[in-house]
Swiss-Prot record:
Keywords: Phosphoprotein, Ribonucleoprotein, Ribosomal protein
Function description: Plays an important role in the elongation step of protein synthesis.
Modified residues (Phosphoserine): S101, S104
Gene3D superfamilies: 1.10.10.1410
Family statement drawn from the similarity comment of this UniProt entry: Belongs to the eukaryotic ribosomal protein P1/P2 family.
Organism of origin: Gallus gallus
Protein name per its UniProtKB record: Large ribosomal subunit protein P1
Quaternary structure and interacting proteins, as annotated: Heterodimer with RPLP2 at the lateral ribosomal stalk of the large ribosomal subunit.
């Protein structure tokens, strides 16, 4: 779990990003001092250096995205025919989605003995 010092630096960096101001050690220190929080002196510099070359906006948007999905394996028989294999699979998925939506419309959440 993050300490108060870490959270103070994180929130300071987010405030600076929201105001479209460059995140620097001095600016983080100024915000922390204005908030009246006591942090160890190395935290603001550490966060400023860590966020120097990172797009904080994309970092915020991709929180929880985790690692990427593994790449799909190529078919064993070689390359698939152009456009031939993908269309039936898409049609099956669409049919399954339609069936699921029809079933969910019928089930109103009432059980037999409710």
């Amino acid at each position: 779990m993050a300490s108060v010092s870490e959270l103070a630096c994180i929130y300071s960096a987010l405030i600076l990003h929201d105001d479209e101001v460059t995140v620097t050690e001095d600016k983080i220190n100024a915000l922390i001092k204005a908030a009246g929080v006591n942090v160890e002196p190395f935290w603001p510099g550490l966060f400023a250096k860590a966020l120097a070359n990172i797009d904080i906006g994309s970092l915020i948007c991709n929180v929880g995205a985790g690692g990427g999905a593994p790449a799909a394996a190529a078919p064993a028989g070689g390359a698939a025919p152009a456009g031939g294999g993908a269309a039936p699979a898409e049609e099956k998925k669409e049919e399954e989605k339609k069936e699921e939506s029809e079933e969910s419309d019928d089930d109103m959440g009432f059980g037999l003995f409710d």
